[in-house]
C-alpha cells in the first residue's frame, strides 16, 4: 500500500495527469490510452474502474493484526500456521463490519483521487499489519468514507486469471500471446 500511495503522490504532483491507472510491472497495456479514456467515458461515465465485493470469508484478515503480514515468512510454514489460527479465531470472534475485497489494479480520475487522499493515512494505519491489504484497502476506504461521492464500476477492465494449479492460485498467471490478443479483442485494457 505504501508503494501504491507513493506512486499516486508522484503522479498526482504532475497537474497534467487527469487519469491514474495502477498496473503491475508485469502488465501489458492492450489499448492506446486515448481508446481507454474514450471507452471509460462512453461506457462507464468515468466511474472508478475498480472491482469491489463483500467477502466475509476474509474476516480473519481484519479481526487482528498479523505479526507475519508482509514478511518473508508469511507464506512459509510458520506464517501459514498463524494464518490458520487467525481463521479459527475468526470463526469464534466475529468481525462486525462488512469486508470489502477486490483487485489492487484500478483506474481513477484526478477528481476521485482528490477525494481519496484525505483518508489514506487513517486507512494505512489500520491496514499496516493486515494480511493482503492491497485486496481490501481502497475498496474499504471508498465504501466506508466515499460511497456517495465515488461510484465504483465493479470492473477494472484488466484480464486477470488466477489458476489454482499455478502457485495455488496466489498470483495471476502469465497470459500467452493468444490470450492477450483475445483479451484485447474483448475490450480489456
Segment roles from a protein language model:
Residues 1-189:
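ER/Golgi luminal nucleotide-sugar-dependent glycosyltransferases, focusing on the catalytic module
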Amino acid at each position: 500500500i505504501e508503494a501504491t500511495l507513493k506512486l499516486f503522490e508522484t503522479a498526482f504532483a504532475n497537474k497534467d495527469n487527469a487519469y491514474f491507472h495502477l498496473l503491475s510491472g508485469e502488465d501489458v497495456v492492450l489499448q492506446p490510452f486515448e481508446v481507454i479514456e474514450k471507452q471509460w467515458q462512453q461506457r462507464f461515465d468515468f466511474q472508478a474502474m475498480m472491482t469491489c465485493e463483500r467477502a466475509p470469508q476474509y474476516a480473519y484478515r481484519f479481526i487482528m493484526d498479523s505479526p507475519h503480514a508482509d514478511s518473508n515468512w508469511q507464506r512459509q510454514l510458520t506464517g501459514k500456521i498463524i494464518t490458520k489460527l487467525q481463521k479459527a479465531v475468526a470463526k469464534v470472534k466475529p468481525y462486525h463490519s462488512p469486508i470489502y475485497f477486490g483487485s489492487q489494479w484500478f483506474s481513477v480520475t484526478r477528481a476521485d483521487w482528490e477525494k481519496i487522499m484525505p483518508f489514506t493515512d487513517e486507512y494505512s494505519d489500520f491496514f499496516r499489519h493486515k494480511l493482503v491489504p492491497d485486496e481490501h484497502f481502497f475498496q474499504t476506504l471508498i465504501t466506508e468514507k466515499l460511497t456517495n461521492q465515488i461510484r465504483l464500476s465493479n470492473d477494472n477492465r484488466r484480464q486477470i486469471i488466477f489458476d489454482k494449479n499455478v502457485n495455488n492460485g496466489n498470483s495471476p498467471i502469465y497470459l500467452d500471446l493468444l490470450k492477450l490478443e483475445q483479451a484485447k479483442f474483448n475490450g480489456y485494457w
